[in-house]
Amino acid sequence: MPKRGKKYLEALKLVDRSKAYPIAEAIELVKKTNIAKFDATVEVAFRLGVDPKKADQQIRGAVVLPHGTGKVARVLVFAKGEKAKEAEAAGADYVGDAEYINKIQQGWFDFDVVVATPDMMGEVGKLGRILGPKGLMPNPKTGTVTFDVAKAVQEIKAGKVEYRVDKAGNIHVPIGKVSFDNEKLAENFAAVYEAILKAKPAAAKGTYVKNVTITSTMGPGIKVDPSTVAVAQ
């Protein structure tokens, strides 16, 4: 285990590690235990009772945070003709086809999200080995393979975030910055939690949400009592 600094250990003393906090208290603690000198990201981690090795227990999707993430994503859209014009009008940072495929193959990654029209996926598929490991491959489940490129770009710019269960059954999602109002962080948290609940696979057995933790970029994890979060079940 890596050696922790003095500031981290001081912050850790503020947290009762045996307790699951109401969301309002947890957010307050995240701010108190933030030791970064920059506007740190606040992230939520869910430990789920699923077996990601089974195809029917994979979880992947996206949710629009009501107050965004505090960062405006750079969007690359693979599209042609009218769809390319729609993407540009919606605010996409980069729009094109073959030239961007070539740039990526040469190591260019000045973007955060990739959107593609379905007719472009034959070409974009060539980038699978490059974009896949980085979590950047367009996917219908996250709304990034679509003919409605304008809507996709607008949602991403407004604060749409993707989530995907990892091999250990965890999902990590950013919900804003420590500078956000507590209420905005709570509402972003609730939006993500509701999306995770709705994404529960029918094949999942036993307790679905086993543990919920929020943390700032360099701060300690704080357990959340999800029963204190108002969501539409």
Swiss-Prot record:
Extract the GO molecular function terms from the UniProt entry. Answer: rRNA binding; structural constituent of ribosome; tRNA binding
Top-level taxon in the UniProt lineage: Bacteria
Could you list this entry's UniProt keywords, alphabetically sorted: Repressor, Ribonucleoprotein, Ribosomal protein, RNA-binding, rRNA-binding, Translation regulation, tRNA-binding
Q: Does the keyword Ribonucleoprotein apply?
A: yes
Q: Name one GO biological process term.
A: regulation of translation
Q: Please give the Pfam families that the UniProt record associates with this protein.
A: Ribosomal_L1 (PF00687)
Q: Does the keyword Ribonucleoprotein apply?
A: yes
Query: Could you name the Gene Ontology cellular component terms for this entry?
Result: large ribosomal subunit
User: What NCBIfam families does the database record attribute to this sequence?
Assistant: rplA_bact
What does the function comment of this entry state?
Binds directly to 23S rRNA. The L1 stalk is quite mobile in the ribosome, and is involved in E site tRNA release.
Quote the PANTHER family the UniProt record gives: 54S RIBOSOMAL PROTEIN L1, MITOCHONDRIAL, LARGE RIBOSOMAL SUBUNIT PROTEIN UL1M
* Similarity section: Belongs to the universal ribosomal protein uL1 family.
Binding partners and assembly: Part of the 50S ribosomal subunit.
Protein's UniProt name: Large ribosomal subunit protein uL1
Q: Which organism is it from?
A: Geobacillus kaustophilus (strain HTA426)
